[in-house]
């Protein structure tokens, strides 16, 4: 999670969300940060998954895990299910748009083709601090 946090661009106008994907030996396969300025689907998770499937030359990421600083939204949670990521680790809960524990609960719905192992609250305070600072600065 520290790697995902460190990859966030705190000077960007985008929400400070970072994601990394590692293989079963914890080797980093991809890393991404939110980049939605010109592409509304440019969430960190989506970009990290695109990069990982390109790097590995596969459609499914069976033996990989994703670390994300914020609970995935419905779009990202569905993509995590489709790509069969083995483990999902995330930092802060997203009480407004979160789709794992907070709201929609994608992995418990019929929309979910696969449910990863889910670990939440990883370095939660550090992840929340990124968000608080970002939105406090936007309100100035």
Regions found by a protein language model. Name each.
Residues 1-140:
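Zinc-dependent deaminase catalytic domain
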